[in-house]
From Swiss-Prot:
Source organism phylogeny: Bacteria, Pseudomonadati, Campylobacterota, Epsilonproteobacteria, Campylobacterales
Protein name: Fructose-1,6-bisphosphatase class 1
Record's subcellular location: Cytoplasm
SUPFAM superfamilies associated with the record: Carbohydrate phosphatase
Catalytic activity: beta-D-fructose 1,6-bisphosphate + H2O = beta-D-fructose 6-phosphate + phosphate
Cofactor annotation comment: Binds 2 magnesium ions per subunit.
Length: 284
């Protein structure tokens, strides 16, 4: 696992350089979900592919930007599912973006995820990484190396931040009431449109909730299970929080039928998730 994390660190520096120096415009292609690809999406995907080609532990790569599985090493142990540049459309307005990695031992599904990591490309490059049985660890880049900032990232029982995703006019009434009730309690809005920076802020500021519900236009949610939802669910649970879907099911129990399946998702401290379950009428 050390080799995989080390590879993520090395490729993160290359992606950060690309963000700072290369064309931020659109390419002439679409990803597997039919979304227009930015040139940075394509470049970041290429950099990650190239980086893992030499890592014999990795059996397959599955990218959010591609439809199929990329076989690497037939004797490898792990499948890595990744979003090469989450929130890439924010780069041209100079907001933080990120990369997400889920490391699966066996079939890619929640129960087989053994480690995950994400990178934040902002004023500084930071990485949060987690393995089973340990609190997530926080690293920050300096002079080309990643130094440990905190060996235990822990969510408080109750937070102060509220990051509600999805177009509000497409929310159901009980989700809107839930969000409004949090603001009535004094919660602060923190939503950039980037999953990585928003969840990173909640994690490092001690707690709160990030929600991306099913909506009238996207009833199955927008965020992809293998690349985004399950890796972050793992990190939030390891930090002492919870991550569930709209029925109260742990996101770590998801079994995607297709690599690009999506799910409504909610990540937060225990207090906020309990309040969400009450609002959604599911058993705590």
């Amino acid at each position: 696992m050390h080799t995989i994390f080390e590879t993520i660190e090395k490729v993160a520096l290359k992606i950060d350089h690309a963000i700072k120096t290369e064309d931020l415009g659109y390419s002439e292609s679409e990803n597997s979900s039919g979304e227009d690809q930015l040139k940075l999406d394509v470049k970041s995907d290429y950099l990650i592919e190239e980086a893992f080609k030499s890592v014999s532990l990795v059996k397959d790569l599955i990218s959010e930007e591609k439809e199929g599985v990329m076989p690497l090493h037939s004797n490898g142990k792990y499948t890595i599912c990744y979003d090469p540049l989450d929130g890439s459309s924010l780069a041209d307005v100079n907001l933080s973006v990120g990369s997400i990695f889920g490391i699966y031992d066996g079939e890619p599904k929640g129960e087989n995820l053994v480690a995950s990591a994400y990178v934040v490309y902002g004023p500084r490059i930071e990485i949060i990484r987690a393995v089973k049985g340990e609190r997530p660890k926080h690293y920050r880049a300096q002079d080309g190396f990643f130094n440990l900032v905190s060996k235990e990232v822990i969510l408080k029982e109750k937070g102060k931040l509220n990051a509600p995703g999805g177009t509000q006019q497409n929310w159901c009434d009980y989700h809107k009431s839930f969000v409004d009730d949090l603001f009535a309690e004094g919660y602060r809005l923190r939503y950039s449109g980037g999953m990585v920076p928003d969840l990173h802020q909640i994690l490092l500021k001690g707690g709160g909730i990030f929600s991306y519900p099913g909506t009238s236009d996207k009833p199955h949610g927008k965020l992809r299970q293998l690349f985004e939802v399950i890796p972050f669910a793992f990190i939030y649970e390891q930090a002492g929080g919870q991550a569930i879907d709209a029925k109260g099911k742990r996101l770590m129990e998801l079994v995607p039928a297709h690599p690009h399946d999506t799910s409504p998702c909610f990540f937060g401290s225990n207090y906020e998730i309990k309040a969400l379950k009450k609002a959604y009428g599911v058993n705590a």
